[in-house]
Amino acid sequence: MTYKIMAINAGSSSLKFQLLNMPQGALLCQGLIERIGLPEARFTLKTSAQKWQETLPIADHHEAVTLLLEALTGRGILSSLQEIDGVGHRVAHGGERFKDAALVCDDTLREIERLAELAPLHNPVNALGIRLFRQLLPAVPAVAVFDTAFHQTLAPEAWLYPLPWRYYAELGIRRYGFHGTSHHYVSSALAEKLGVPLSALRVVSCHLGNGCSVCAIKGGQSVNTSMGFTPQSGVMMGTRSGDLDPSILPWLVEKEGKSAQQLSQLLNNESGLLGVSGVSSDYRDVEQAADAGNERAALALSLFAERIRATIGSYIMQMGGLDALIFTGGIGENSARARAAICRNLHFLGLALDDEKNQRSATFIQADNALVKVAVINTNEELMIARDVMRLALPQARELAVSA
């Protein structure tokens, strides 16, 4: 038996979606509604055979969801909306409460909205997406899949910041970690490709895109991750600084009179590859500039790799060794240069790349005699979301859901 599951990612002015046939994971359609709220919004819908794109005014998310559901039947992808068996929603922040994906009920929704103080840019619109689909598809079960849930297995030594205790106890300031759905998916896919239980492996997963995070996975569980209280921390990213000396911030307040909002803008949108190179936040553009002799661009690439290498090294020490290193995300999946820079001079760990395999982004790119496996795995958060819907919302389908 097959089930049609929707995976939804609602952004502040966008709605990203996939419709999958489960448990096979076959993609029936995917698309994006962007520039919601503007007179020239754009709706893109793709199947394996066709692509439709339309520019039109879309006033709000309610109109966007209505348009999407009408298109599914209007374009013949579904004969009826009753064919939809479940909807999974990506939610940025689950706090300490959600240690797994959760079946949506009124209480779940209220908690997602309460956690908006920890993710003010994401949780409110994630909750809005859930409410709209519940309103328009009232008979269809919904599941919330949290970016933070996979990291709820961290020990206190990994998640607690050395601040006065009350900042954790009263304000919830601690490491939460993000990209959890991606790290969970690629580590599970790695174990499947190796034919080894994930519980038997020590893995470091590098999700490298415009946002970047590194995750240590031991015994099938996240034991450390580079992003912390917010997705701004950790390694260097496209426009985000990652970790830096916290005293820089009050110093900038005194020196330049910057407000909290200006500091947030600086750290989140003006730093990282863009800030150091002065060229772009896109790794490919910085590569091109470095190849043309731009010294700051070359420095940005080196700094990017070194921050990741330092994080990987600390995780290897924490886990007592390494069995596999995973690269995923836009940079991790596509940049042989980034992978080579990160894996440089690691022969002493039993980790070495095969240059030819790395250049063609083979699934496994380690040298033949290397002890540590190095894998390039395309992430698929939507498939992971659909699996969680199968597992939690469709009891009759649990045995069909691929274990994750």
Curated annotation (Swiss-Prot):
Q: Which UniProt keywords apply?
A: ATP-binding, Cytoplasm, Kinase, Nucleotide-binding, Transferase
Give the EC number(s) under which this enzyme is classified: 2.7.2.15
Record-level GO cellular component terms: cytoplasm
Which reaction(s) are listed as its catalytic activity? propanoate + ATP = propanoyl phosphate + ADP
User: Which biological process terms from the Gene Ontology are attached to this UniProt entry?
Assistant: acetate metabolic process; propanediol catabolic process; propionate catabolic process
Query: Which enzyme class?
Result: transferase
The pathway this protein participates in, as annotated, is:
Polyol metabolism; 1,2-propanediol degradation
> What compartments host this protein?
Cytoplasm
Q: Name one GO molecular function term.
A: ATP binding
What is this protein's function?
A: Works with phosphate acetyltransferase (pta) to capture exogenous propionate and regenerate propionyl-CoA during degradation of 1,2-propanediol (1,2-PD).
Q: What is this protein called?
A: Propionate kinase
State the species of origin. Klebsiella pneumoniae subsp. pneumoniae (strain ATCC 700721 / MGH 78578)
